[in-house]
Amino acid sequence: MNTATQPNCVIRIPAKDSYSTSGPTLMGRQSANEGFLTSWFRHSGHAEFWCMARFRDEAQVFARIGEHVHQGHKAKPVYRWIAQQQIHRIRSVGTLYAPGPQVADLAWMRRRNEQASATDFSIVGMTHTSCELSIQDGLANMLTAPVYPWDAQICPSVSVQTMVQRLLDDEAAWLREHLGATRVQSPPLPVLPLGVDCAALDLPAADKAQHRARWRQQWALSDRDVCVLYMGRLDLRTKANLLPMLDALQLAAQQLQAENGPRLHLVLAGWFASEWDETHLRAAVAQVCPDVRVVFEDGRTPEARQ
C-alpha cells in the first residue's frame, strides 16, 4: 500500500465521456465525475496523475482535462497511463478509483492478473444511482467477487447507502438460502457527499441580473410572474417521477388564480432519454397541470447550465 503523506490514486477511465459533460447523453453522474476529476487535478497537490484505461486515446482525454486545469501553472504535472492488462502496476500507487459501482469487475481483474495480489492495492467505487438494473447487478456482484475490507463502495448520501445496504442484505439472504453460504463479505459503504465548486458556478451580481432578465424575456415572463425551475434529465423511469411536483404546481396555480395573483410558469430545463419519454411527459404535463404554463428548455447547453 502507498504510505505517502499525500496518498495518490489511479483514476479509472471506463469511456471517453465518463468525465465529460459535453456529450449528447449527459447524465448527472458525468457532471459529478467531471467536478471530481477537475477538483482532483486542482487541489490534490500531486506532481503525478495516474489513470487506468483500455486504450491510449481514453488516457489522452484524461491528460487533456488535466492540462486544461493546469494551464498557466509553472510546474507542469506528469500524466501516466496504466493499461488494464497491467493492473498490477497500481501496486506502486496504492488505490484504484472507479467512477461507478465497478468494484466487483475490477476485483476479478485484480485476481486474474498473475502479477497482482489482493493486498497490493485497494479498489474504491462510487455509486451515484441505485435505480438502474445494471447498477444493482454490479452492486450485488460484490458479494461473490474477491472483494475485501480494504476495498470500498462510496455512497453520496445516507439514502443511497441505505438502499445499497438493503440490496446487499437481500442478496446475502439469497446466497445463504440457495447455496448454504455461512460467510458473506461485503466492502465498507462510506458516505461521502458530493462536493460543489460554488466559485465556478457563481457570477458577479451584474451578470446574474443580466442573465435573469435575458431568460425571463426569452420565456415571455412578466415581472409579476412566478417561475419554477426544474433542472435535470427528463427520464420518468430512471431519474425522477415529476407527478408530485406537477400536482403541487396545479394546486398552487388554482389558488393564485382564485386570489387574482401572478401567473405560474414551470421551466423544465433538461433533456429527454427517448421519444417515448418526451411524448408521455408532454402529455402528462398537459393533463396534470393545465393551469400552469410549461416551457421546455434544452438543459445541456452551457448557457442553460450556467
Question: What residues fall within each predicted segment?
Answer:
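N-terminal pre-catalytic "stem/leader" segment of glycosyltransferase-like enzymes
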Residues: 1-93
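A short, active-site helix/loop in glycosyltransferases that binds the activated sugar's phosphate group
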Residues: 140-211
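Nucleotide-sugar donor-binding and catalytic loop/hinge architecture
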Residues: 114-118, 183, 205-227, 255-261
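Extended catalytic core of nucleotide-activated donor transferases of GT-like folds
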Residues: 57-146
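Short donor-sugar binding/catalytic loops of nucleotide-sugar-dependent glycosyltransferases
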Residues: 18, 231-238, 272-273, 300
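Conserved donor-binding/catalytic core segment of Leloir-type glycosyltransferases
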Residues: 222-239, 246
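Short hydrophobic "strand-cap" motifs at the C-terminus of beta-strands
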Residues: 126-127, 156, 195, 230-234, ...
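Nucleotide-activated donor-binding/catalytic signature segment of Leloir-type glycosyltransferases, i.e.
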Residues: 260-272, 278-306
